[in-house]
Amino acid sequence: IKTALPGLDIIAEDLGFMTPEVIALREYSGFPGMKVLQFAFDSREPSDYLPHRYPTNCICYTGTHDNATLAQWLGDAKGDDVAYAKQYLGLNDEEGYVNGIIRGGMSSVADLFVAQMQDWLALGGETRMNVPGVLGHGNWCWRMLPGALTDELADHIAAMTAMYSR
């Protein structure tokens, strides 16, 4: 692939069940893998999605187009999972839980960090991009409203970007 398409940036979608062969192929390719913060806080088992376990050669996401927004996840997740996220990331009401999760991704060692605009705006499930396996239902229709990106939010994003050298 690298020979046929030089200069093309490729991300290995290494989500879900990972066999040793798939892990070896990703490592051999050198392509960065995906780390989704929402997957980190399943309180039932240890997780490679926790930021302290990230390799640098990865991309950290708050969620993907197929995930709930962070605000929806916080409302829908099991209490133990949210409690684990609160403890691990030091989430508090003053900063806001959604903002604290974004901070957790921004401060990770991942080479890249991606947050959905819905998460920066702390929007709920009505702004979810896609519900897998469901046709219609507003999938792929969300658009940011004019004026939603305020100067205050832009300054906040810029400050976090500078603070964490992103």
PLM features: what roles do these ranges have?
Residues I1-R166:
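Catalytic cores of glycan-processing enzymes that make or break glycosidic bonds
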